[in-house]
Amino acid sequence: SDMNTYHHTNKPEVTIKSEPKITEAGKLSFFLISVTENDKNIPLEVVHTMKMHLLLVNEELTWFDHIHPEEQTDGTYFVSETFPSAGKYLLFIDYKPIGGEATVETHTVEVQGKQLPGSPELQTKLVAAIDGYLVTLVNRNDLKTNRKQSLQFSVEKNGTRLQEKDMQPYLGATAHIVMINKADKDFLHIHPKSDYRFPIYAETYIEKAGLYRMWVQFKIDGEVRTADFTVVVSEGAKTEESPNNHSGHH
């Protein structure tokens, strides 16, 4: 029997129109995103307080942005961005059709114009300092594939360790985490859960070993800050237990 009777028959189609047609570094670009089935815009569910998340990175994974396209009256989504430098960028569009599966769709954009000097090769980076906050991945030496993997962060300000209660909710959680594999740009969208030991704590399942870039966004005093890390995930022993969700949304 057909297992898919209750699901959307096809994967929805995602299209992006850019205005101006040529995307140029340092200039405002506008994107109109549609998610359609049979040429009709389909309704999306609110996930983590938003109907659509757009995560943008450059190919070197040194630049990151996370924005939320606004729904238009016709059911399309509109957003603007300014890219810092010429080159290739990846756009991860994260959405969930009502009654459908959470989906991450990847698009690339070639940005023309001024090329900023290239970034140095990625080195591991396990502590991030931003606006006087020191964010540390506490269990950085214990990241493995093939198991439920916790991510434990401490946050300090002027030598004082912050607690979970010091974090303001951002997108319905204590923080928002994205991990992208450097080699094949595999994308993990991770939403923290509560854990009294850490101001930011999450669990995920990492399928591929290797070097990852990680961005942790947290909100304090009404301002969202982004801490970035470069971490190594090693191969864990294969077990029988494998999660049923491989959509990249954890």
Task: Label the predicted regions.
Residues 27-40, 93, 134-136, 148-162:
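Beta-strand-rich structural segments
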Residues 63, 72-78, 196-201:
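Aromatic sugar-binding surface patches on proteins
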Residues 71, 77-85, 206-207:
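Residue-level recognition of secondary-structure-to-loop junctions
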Residues 84, 94-98, 217-221:
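Beta-strand-rich extracellular modules
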